[in-house]
Every structure is written in C-alpha cells, then in structure tokens.
C-alpha cells in the first residue's frame, strides 16, 4: 500500500515522463537488452537501435501500461489484468525478468531526472513497480 506522499512522488515523476513514453521506453528496453542479454529472447523482432521504429513503438506500449498503472494505482489488478494474461498465458515471459526491468527503469529515471530523482522518489517508485510486477505475475501457474 502506498502512502499519500508516495503516490504524490509517483505522480510527480510520471508528469515528467508523460509525453516522452516512447523515448523512455526505448531506452529502458535497450538498457535491459544490454545489461541482461538473455531478455532479448522475448523481443527477437526489435532492433537494438534506439531510434528503431519497432523499439520506440514497444517502448511506448510498455510505458503506456505504466501510465495506466499510475492512473489506477488503487486498483492495479483491474488495470493490468489483460496485460497479466498476455504475459503469463500467451507470451510466457519468465517472471524473474520483471525485477530486472524494474532495476533498469530506476537507472533510466535517475539518468534523466538526476538530482530531482531523490532517494524517497526512488523508494516510492520501487514500491509501486514491485506492486505492478506482483500483479503481472499473479496469473502464472
């Protein structure tokens, strides 16, 4: 459960990301593929070039899902249920990859926001993204 202050910090950071989802998402994916090359197996169709159209498109979709989670922080299950079904039942993404993605997301945020991304904001985002990952992995059996 997120405190009112944590929710405000998440919304504050999201306001800085909004409108740049494709760029943040593409950078997140590139960092994930670079640091954890085994994750590329789920994205064989994506080029490892930050301005690649498909990479930007998938980055946009990923961060749109994060944005939906930010908007529905009180009901993540309902907001993310279709995405959870997709990852667990169709794509069969190894749930061990979600913490790797979270780690890379923190680095992308910190690299862009620098001093604005305080320890408290990082903690709030970690708690929030961990909650998102929990919801996304609930459908695994």
UniProtKB/Swiss-Prot annotation:
Q: Which residues form the Globin domain?
A: 1-141
Q: Which InterPro entries match?
A: Globin, Globin-like_sf, Globin/Proto, Hemoglobin_a-typ, Hemoglobin_oxygen_transport
- Which residue spans adopt a coiled-coil conformation according to this UniProt entry? none
Q: Name one GO cellular component term.
A: haptoglobin-hemoglobin complex
Protein keywords: Heme, Iron, Metal-binding, Oxygen transport, Transport
| Annotated signal peptide | none
Q: Please list the tissues where expression of this protein has been recorded.
A: Expressed in erythroid tissues.
Binding of heme b occurs at 58, 87
Q: Name one Pfam family in it.
A: Globin
- Alphabetized GO MF terms: heme binding; metal ion binding; oxygen binding; oxygen carrier activity
The biological processes this protein is annotated with in GO are:
cellular oxidant detoxification; hydrogen peroxide catabolic process
Q: Which PANTHER family match?
A: HEMOGLOBIN FAMILY MEMBER, HEMOGLOBIN SUBUNIT MU
- What does the similarity note say? Belongs to the globin family.
By what name is this protein known? Answer: Hemoglobin subunit mu
Q: What organism is the protein native to?
A: Homo sapiens
